[in-house]
């Protein structure tokens, strides 16, 4: 069975939609919002890799590696900020993040 580019784009669109719904439907938990953003970035990476393989060009795959690197750094920094915020406030609810001073 041949898996064409349409299959990859369908899976990527589903992943992107789930990520968008995760952001808009769950506004109380910051960790789930970060996970939804990561899911959106992974769906974009899947698009880059699928088109790169379809067009026989490595630029999309190299760009996807750069996006993965930036996404890993973003997740690490975001989680570190959340850990410090939890130690100071005792909660990581979005309502508590909105009352930050500075």
UniProtKB/Swiss-Prot annotation:
UniProt xrefs under InterPro entries: NADH_UbQ_OxRdtase_chain4L/K, NUOK/Mnh_C1-like
Pfam families, sorted: Oxidored_q2
Localization (cell): Cell inner membrane
Keyword ATP-binding: no
Membrane topology category: Multi-pass membrane protein
UniProt keyword terms in alphabetical order: Cell inner membrane, Cell membrane, Membrane, NAD, Quinone, Translocase, Transmembrane, Transmembrane helix, Transport, Ubiquinone
Listed GO biological process terms: ATP synthesis coupled electron transport
TM regions (residue ranges): 5-25, 31-51, 66-86
Cleavable signal peptide: none
EC number(s) from the headed UniProt entry: 7.1.1.-
Recorded catalytic activity of this chain's protein: a quinone + NADH + 5 H(+)(in) = a quinol + NAD(+) + 4 H(+)(out)
GO CC entries: NADH dehydrogenase complex; plasma membrane
GO molecular function: NADH:ubiquinone reductase (non-electrogenic) activity; quinone binding
Chief location category: membrane
PANTHER family the UniProt entry points to: NADH DEHYDROGENASE SUBUNIT 4L-RELATED, NADH-UBIQUINONE OXIDOREDUCTASE SUBUNIT ND4L
Subunit architecture: NDH-1 is composed of 14 different subunits. Subunits NuoA, H, J, K, L, M, N constitute the membrane sector of the complex.
HAMAP family per UniProt: NDH1_NuoK (MF_01456)
Function as written in the Swiss-Prot or TrEMBL entry: NDH-1 shuttles electrons from NADH, via FMN and iron-sulfur (Fe-S) centers, to quinones in the respiratory chain. The immediate electron acceptor for the enzyme in this species is believed to be ubiquinone. Couples the redox reaction to proton translocation (for every two electrons transferred, four hydrogen ions are translocated across the cytoplasmic membrane), and thus conserves the redox energy in a proton gradient.
Family affiliation: Belongs to the complex I subunit 4L family.
Listed name of the protein: NADH-quinone oxidoreductase subunit K
Organism: Bartonella bacilliformis (strain ATCC 35685 / KC583 / Herrer 020/F12,63)
Gene, per the UniProt record: nuoK
């Amino acid at each position: 069975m041949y898996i064409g580019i349409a299959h990859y784009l369908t899976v990527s669109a589903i992943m992107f939609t789930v990520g968008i719904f995760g952001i808009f439907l769950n506004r109380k938990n910051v960790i789930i919002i970060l996970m939804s953003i990561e899911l959106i970035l992974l769906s974009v990476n899947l698009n880059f890799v699928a088109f790169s393989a379809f067009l026989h060009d490595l630029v999309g795959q190299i760009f996807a590696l750069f996006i993965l690197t930036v996404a890993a750094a973003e997740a690490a920094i975001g989680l570190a900020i959340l850990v410090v915020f939890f130690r100071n406030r005792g909660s990581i609810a979005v309502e508590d993040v909105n009352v930050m001073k500075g």
